[in-house]
């Protein structure tokens, strides 16, 4: 399984992006719980979820910076 592509995250709308961030955070919580209580089925899935969350948060931040007025003016 390959790591998720950031281009896919950039194609999402604002609502979809927020939903995806929430879903990924919930998945990470489940994986952490799974790691603490028993051996995870797919150990690499934790890395992929963290990577995906970082991508989604990066895209969200890029959009925030695009929409904010420039402070240099």
Swiss-Prot record:
One of its GO terms (molecular function) is structural constituent of ribosome. One of its GO terms (biological process) is translation. CDD domains: Ribosomal_L29_HIP. Keywords: Ribonucleoprotein, Ribosomal protein. InterPro entries: Ribosomal_protein_uL29 (IPR050063), Ribosomal_uL29 (IPR001854), Ribosomal_uL29_CS (IPR018254), Ribosomal_uL29_sf (IPR036049). GO terms for cellular component: cytosolic large ribosomal subunit. Belongs to the universal ribosomal protein uL29 family. HAMAP family: Ribosomal_uL29. This is Large ribosomal subunit protein uL29.
